[in-house]
């Protein structure tokens, strides 16, 4: 579940293992980003380590133990380690996510060209505030979508995790519903997008989170 994944990410962030990649995809994000096609179900956690002077097998095994402690399941063949070659070990859900991540900007532009409202935004908050912040942001976006006449999805992924907090990203993809049977023009789509953007920023402010996280400051 997503809740179990959040607990696992927090444990990893506070374990001192320092994964190079630790991304948690909610079920919708996993479906969109590709890991679901590789056999993963529900929320998906992708964890990776790298090092130039030490073996990684034991570190990765300990990380998987931590995930298991919080209810995570490791799909058959999901663990991949490549020692000594200098080449990355890829496959399964991780490779599916990577491919989707690289395609995403092109797909976004294509969707916008087809009249779909697409937005991605980020925040960061303390671990103790994550559950309430996540719920408030999702509710605010959903309400704004309903008010603006947008039908679509809201997904979330955790991209960065730290001992004291977490940085979730949210993606909105929605189709504007025509008003009075008239086609939805560009200005109308922009206005509806702006309503969603404003609602997300208001929720972030109300929950005392930040409008960005480290690398964008």
Feature-to-residue mapping (PLM):
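C-terminal substrate-recognition/cap domain of FAD-linked oxidoreductases
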Residues: 6-199, 203, 207-208
């Amino acid at each position: 579940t997503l809740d179990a994944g959040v607990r696992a990410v927090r444990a990893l962030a506070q374990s001192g293992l320092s994964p190079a990649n630790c991304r948690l995809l909610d079920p919708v994000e996993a479906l969109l980003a590709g890991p679901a096609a590789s056999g993963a179900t529900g929320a998906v956690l992708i964890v990776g380590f790298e090092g130039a002077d030490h073996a990684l097998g034991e570190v990765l095994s300990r990380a998987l133990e931590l995930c298991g402690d919080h209810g995570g399941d490791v799909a058959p063949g999901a663990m991949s380690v490549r020692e000594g070659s200098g080449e990355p070990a890829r496959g399964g859900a991780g490779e599916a996510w990577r491919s989707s991540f690289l395609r995403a900007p092109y797909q976004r532009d294509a969707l916008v060209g087809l009249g779909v409202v697409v937005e991605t935004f980020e925040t960061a908050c303390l671990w103790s505030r994550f559950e309430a912040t996540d719920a408030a942001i999702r509710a605010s976006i959903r309400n704004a979508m309903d008010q603006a006449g947008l039908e679509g999805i809201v997904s979330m992924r955790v991209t960065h995790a730290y001992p004291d907090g977490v940085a979730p990203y949210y993606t909105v993809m929605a189709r504007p519903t025509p008003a009075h049977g008239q086609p939805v023009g560009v200005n109308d789509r922009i206005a509806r997008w702006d309503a969603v953007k404003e609602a997300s920023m208001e929720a972030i402010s109300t929950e005392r989170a930040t409008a960005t996280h480290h690398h964008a400051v």
